[in-house]
Amino acid sequence: AERIRCGGMGLGGVLTKTGLGTIVEKGKQMIEVNGQQYLLETALRADVALTHSRRADPIGNLTFRGSTGRADHPLIATCADLSIVECDHFCDLGEISPETVEVPGMFIDMILV
């Protein structure tokens, strides 16, 4: 998830100690910070992201149902060049309260109803 988050935020990657001294570190860049060794896990981007939302409005603002939707779908929507969402309910503009928007429309390219 952190690699996807980095891709969506335009970051180069994330430093982690996870995998040090294991087969995971093979071929990965090691970086030293304050005398501590870290592996660089580079950012992940996608050409296309497909996701599902509970509600969407005409400009692509989304809400989700359940903790899984809130945890993963917003990350996926931000890291893709083309982000497509399928929604259960297509709302009129203004029907989704700004406080409940979990993915802003600027990250959504296409809505399937």
Predicted regions and their residues:
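Conserved alpha/beta enzyme-core scaffold
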Residues: A1-V113
